[in-house]
A protein has these predicted regions:
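ATP-binding N-terminal substructure of ATP-dependent carboxylate-amine bond-forming enzymes
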Residues: 1-115, 150-153, 388, 392-413
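Active-site nucleotide/adenylate-binding loops and adjacent lid/helix of ATP-dependent enzymes
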Residues: 120-207, 228-231, 260, 411
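Phosphate-binding site of ATP-dependent enzymes
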Residues: 186-246, 257-267, 284-293
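Gly/Ser/Thr-rich active-site loops/lids in small-molecule metabolic enzymes
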Residues: 188, 303-322
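Flexible, glycine/charged-enriched surface loops at secondary-structure junctions
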Residues: 207, 276-280, 330-335
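Glycine-rich phosphate/pyrophosphate-binding beta-alpha loops
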Residues: 241-253, 298-312
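Conserved metal-phosphate-binding beta-hairpin within the catalytic cores
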Residues: 271-306
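Peripheral (often C-terminal) accessory segments that flank ATP-dependent C-N-forming ligase machineries
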Residues: 319-418
């Protein structure tokens, strides 16, 4: 596809410490391939994403939640340097909430959807999202919020085992090098172990959620863009084929599939909360009662957005860019059956599935037939993939060393995919 006007620059923003954030790379490639000048603001030096040939420039800026003024100054400097309003695209929770909280100041230099800060925070918080679903009558898994270990055990009697244990604020776990923010506890011992890993002293950070049986393909994703009037200009659905970490994590292999019911319940929910901008939602189909239950809402771009590409090449980032620069967003039809892969994550996930006896190496290779796009590898932009491989090896070696030291010290460890 082609855009009539690509003169407005785009700034991709990440605020959390995640060096292998493939969503940012997807945005860079999606817009720059059409001729849009794209810049990246993040806090990682020499990250794999920096190596993309499509980037016009990289600004290293560290976000401190305790002192956001410094980050705001850094973004203002970027805006002044560009010399004209740029489309601002946050790709993580911290960045999205920062933009919502400081919208008035940022509008001097940037273009972005007008999403109320209260709405963004309500959707990003697992606690407030559950309460919101309950108030609106939107089906969701039963969720409980224990205040201590004893209450966690007591409440698990109410939900039954297995139970899904989640961190209310996964970002707190980055500081403790705990990658897995979601665990399926199948016994009281596993529940207590998960509690010890996820809880934060003096700040309850754990919830218990009803376990809904089903594989990855029972999770339905919605990826969409809503304009300033709340109209959904683009909205696609799809399912997870594999997750990393397995059974609880983000998509490592997904397929675009139309589901009119998920489309309808999602657009009704988004209208009820007054949503604007790019959104990424997850629903799980509960075969026990036939209902789709809302698992989470990302009030921002989802990392798997390039799974959802229309027959005319449209995706939510391109729809956002067109709309914010005053260009029409064409009607688009999803490419049903399109498959998308996060290469390192799916490889790691396949090893776990293999140990569980549900996926052989040959079956894994066969499952990759038909994949149209990888999150990292691109024939026209191969260097980020090579840099990612090197960074992944370095990170794995460091994690192995920390795990060994933790075992010697008797501390709990965890592993996962980012």
């Amino acid at each position: 596809m082609r855009l009539a006007d690509t003169s407005t620059p785009a700034v991709v923003l990440t605020a959390s410490p995640a060096p292998l954030l493939h969503g940012a790379l997807g945005v860079i490639r999606s817009l720059a391939r059409l001729g849009v000048p794209v810049y990246l603001v993040h806090d990682e030096r020499r990250a794999p994403t920096d190596r993309s040939k499509y980037l016009r420039g990289v600004v290293v800026a560290r976000y401190d939640q305790a002192e956001p003024a410094g980050f705001l100054d850094d973004l203002a400097a970027v805006g002044r340097r560009l010399g004209r309003p740029a489309v601002l695209i946050p790709v993580d929770d911290l960045g999205a909430l920062f933009v919502a909280d400081h919208a008035a100041a940022l509008r001097e230099w940037f273009l972005f959807p007008d999403l109320e800060a209260d709405t963004a925070h309500a959707l990003a918080s697992k606690r407030s999202l559950y309460l919101l679903c309950h108030r609106l009558g939107v089906p969701s898994p039963e969720t409980l919020f224990p205040r201590d270990r004893d209450e966690a055990l007591a409440l698990s009697e109410r939900t039954g085992l297995p139970v899904v244990v989640k961190a209310i604020d996964p970002l707190l776990l980055y500081q403790r090098e705990q990658a897995r923010s979601v665990v399926v506890a199948r016994s009281r011992r596993e529940l207590l172990d998960a509690y010890d890993r996820l809880e934060v002293l003096g700040r309850p950070n754990l919830l218990l959620q009803e376990y809904i049986p089903g594989g990855a393909d029972s999770i339905w994703m919605f990826n969409g863009y809503l304009d300033a009037g709340g109209r959904c200009l683009l909205g696609f659905t799809g399912t997870k084929l594999r997750q990393c970490p397995p059974h609880t994590g983000p998509t490592s292999l997904g397929v675009c599939r139309r589901n009119p019911l998920v489309e309808r319940v999602t657009t009704e929910f988004l209208a009820a909360v007054g949503y604007r901008g790019i959104v990424d939602l997850g629903w799980r189909h509960d075969a026990r009662d036939g209902r789709y239950k809302l698992l989470d809402v990302n009030p921002r771009l989802g990392g798997s957005f390039r799974l959802f590409v229309a027959t005319n090449g449209m995706d939510v980032v391109r729809a956002l860019y067109l709309d914010l620069t005053g260009q029409p967003v064409p009607a688009s039809t999803a490419r049903d059956g399109r498959m998308w892969l996060v290469e390192p994550n799916d490889l790691r996930a396949s090893l776990v599935y293999r140990r569980e006896g549900v996926l052989t190496s040959r079956q894994w290779l066969r499952s990759l037939r038909g994949v149209e796009e990888g999150a990292w590898f691109a024939g026209d932009d191969p260097v980020p993939f090579l840099a990612m491989c090197g960074a992944a090896v370095t990170m794995a070696a460091g994690k192995a060393a920390r795990t060994a030291l933790a075992r010697v010290a008797g501390r709990p460890t965890s592993a996962g995919c980012r």
